[in-house]
Amino acid sequence: MITDTKKIFGLLLSVGFSSIGFIAAITVTVLAAREVSNNPLFLGFPNAVGVGGAFLGTQMFYKISKKYSRLAALSLTFFVGALGSVVLFYSLIVDSFILLMIGALILGFGQSATLQSRYAASFVASEKFKATALSLAVWFSVFGSVFGPRLVSVYSDYFDNLFNSELIVGYIVAMVGMLFASASVLTFTTS
């Protein structure tokens, strides 16, 4: 029971961290698209491409989980999402809409891991606690809605001084959140 509780805790942490990161990123993505693109018709494209990335991430998750395990697939998919955040960060540095789109696609992989983590928590739980584990996972995702935009607003001036773009903070929070999510899956779910 202790091992299952530890695994569920790790999965819940991964949901919380990745939600904070992902919500921080999508908070600034439309504004970032406006910053790097001159055409207002393109503003919604990065978030739409991110949904496609979530689809591709789910496919990647499925293939890796068949070959290794669900938990290894989750950890790797979160890590790929963190790489997407790095690409998004760089897209603002070099002022590239194409890189913004590629980064949004790759970050979508991390979002797919967030969604998969919710269900993985219920798979790990015993029959008696499956519903509780799933409910807690959904509640942990609420942290992203609350703290993601808050972190962006608190640190935007600091990163504006460093990188000449206050929007970069959303991608830094996303990278850290996805890396912490990957680490929490690795740390708490290995026996």
Identify the function of each model-found stretch.
Residues 1-53:
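Helix-loop boundary and gating motifs at the non-cytosolic
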Residues 29-31, 111-126:
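Intracellular juxtamembrane helix-capping segments at the cytosolic ends
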Residues 53, 132-152:
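Glycine-rich segments within core transmembrane alpha-helices of 12-TM secondary carriers
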Residues 57-70, 156:
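Helix-to-loop junctions at the C-terminal end of transmembrane segments
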Residues 79-94:
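C-terminal ends and interior cores of transmembrane alpha-helices
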Residues 148, 152-153, 157, 175-191:
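C-terminal membrane-cytosol helix-exit motif in multi-pass small-molecule transporters
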